[in-house]
Amino acid sequence: MPRTLVTNCGEAARHFVGDGDYIAKAVVSGGFRENGRRYAIFTTPVTPDDLPDDAVRSAPVIYQERIANRFDLRVTVVGERVFAARISIPDDDKSEADWRAVDPARVAYEIHELPPALEAACVAYVKAHALVFAALDFIITPQGDYVFIEINPSGQWGWLEDATGVPITDAIVDCLITGAA
């Protein structure tokens, strides 16, 4: 996992990001409305100059070391079932800190086979947090290393089904019907 800090203290945030290559992202994804328009909040590069106290204190933010990536990976765990989807963007879009900020027509999705040990670790991690469902995000580095970024206990999955055909909804229904975890 990259170096990570969650804070709403400007001094702590500035000290943490220092001279390094860091990103900032919302603790809760979403967006906001202004003048009748909806805006998304994406992960963005950040420097100490971006973090005056008054801009940081209103809500906690996740600050994380930026990791070079070959592609992103969303791993959805439902009970004992694991679905992994590779999320790729063209090299000329790699300057974006968040693939969601890239033109959706340029984002490619495909089913990804996890190493068995990582798949088992994902299931164990979800269970250790007393969850039956969770979405785990990883970055795959240019060297092929898997770097865990975060776990989301209410991660979206419909878009992955649409893009790859993975049967996440069926797995959730099975879990609900059987009570299996």
List PLM regions with ranges.
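FMN-binding flavodoxin-like domain, especially the glycine-rich phosphate-binding loop
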Residues: R3-T7, E11
